[in-house]
Amino acid sequence: MTYPDPTLFGHDPWWLVLAKSLGIFAFLLLTVLAAILIERKVLGRMQLRFGPNRVGPHGLLQSLADGVKLALKEGLVPAGVDKWIYLAAPIISVIPAFMAFAVIPMGGEVSVFGHRTALQLTDLPVAVLYILAVTSIGVYGIVLAGWASGSVYPLLGGLRSSAQVISYEIAMALSFAAVFIYAGTMSTSGIVAAQNDTWYIVLLLPSFLVYVTAMVGETNRAPFDLPEAEGELVGGFHTEYSSLKFAMFMLAEYVNMTTVSALATTLFLGGWHAPWPISIADGANSGWWPLLWFTVKVWLFLFFFMWLRATLPRMRYDQFMALGWKILIPVSLGWIMIVAITHSLRDQGYQAPATAAIGLAVAAVILLALLGRSRLRARRIRPEPIRPAGDGAFPVPPLPVKTRALEDADA
């Protein structure tokens, strides 16, 4: 296998940089078109009904037809909105979604017309933090859309989205810390190279579980789609949007799904490395084959998003916030402490069994502390006395039929 040379980044000819940029853009657009169609097919299969099957053979052109339909719709601007912010919000939401994919490694070094280049647009010493920062900008589009719409429900959806991102981005960043400790770098290509022997999903399983939960919350997908809850907020932050403006919000959502799936592949599933036992074969991790393994792993996470939407109901808002602040963040902090201790002991020459034993002991202590705290809270909570029905309530007036009957009886 051929790992990208960090010195290659920034030295590609302009036409190669342009070609890779267009390739990433086309990859994301095709992934979005396919994901929308496959999601509708999967939901139909899981709900015992037919999915889209009218436009094109077996409904394969349904996503394209929906895009054309949205493009041809009239772009209405409701009265009372802050027009320029209202129009800028979808753009602010969709641009960071594409920008985050610039540092995702999709393969090793390949030859393009005699030029050696990496299947990655660029890389940074803090590439993962760049992704975290850029994806955070996208929430401004949602918040501004809710504020500029001049309506109550979009405003509530925007506020929910901001609280959601603040809550779950902390847990997501903490899950990154364990990867940084093991890899010794924040560069995405360096993290992939560090997983040559063992993928981090094996070594850092709690971090992987925290990240998977947080990435669903970050992308506003079911069961964490509270900013656009149809039963509560009509359509949430994009209630007042139609035509291409609404399509841009949908595009940003699916591109963000692809980005967080690609980041999960990079951090925990070995990136573009071939899975075992395919990796044993000669040439499995060289040439253009890594692009195939990378795409397959990304689609596994996209199917996971679809599976969650089809099977789980939407969470209650207070339960959703409690999951982020009371479970994910404390678990992440405890796990980082364990990873730091075991990694330090390993660097000092202690054997792996001793390190594992210490790690298990620390994990047991943290688990017992959390269980003891929850039991203590359960003891403090006592049931409130049941008030009699109608006590303190407004008296119910008699029905007209009963009133007339009483008057007739008195007469």
Curated annotation (Swiss-Prot):
Q: What is its EC number?
A: 7.1.1.-
TM annotation in the entry: 18-38, 84-104, 124-144, 165-185, 198-218, 260-280, 288-308, 321-341, 352-372
One Gene Ontology term, aspect cellular component: plasma membrane
Compartments where found: Cell membrane
Similarity field: Belongs to the complex I subunit 1 family.
The record's function comment reads: NDH-1 shuttles electrons from NADH, via FMN and iron-sulfur (Fe-S) centers, to quinones in the respiratory chain. The immediate electron acceptor for the enzyme in this species is believed to be menaquinone. Couples the redox reaction to proton translocation (for every two electrons transferred, four hydrogen ions are translocated across the cytoplasmic membrane), and thus conserves the redox energy in a proton gradient. This subunit may bind ubiquinone.
Q: What is this protein called?
A: NADH-quinone oxidoreductase subunit H
Q: Which GO terms describe its molecular function?
A: NADH dehydrogenase activity; oxidoreductase activity, acting on NAD(P)H, quinone or similar compound as acceptor; quinone binding
Assembly, per entry: NDH-1 is composed of 14 different subunits. Subunits NuoA, H, J, K, L, M, N constitute the membrane sector of the complex.
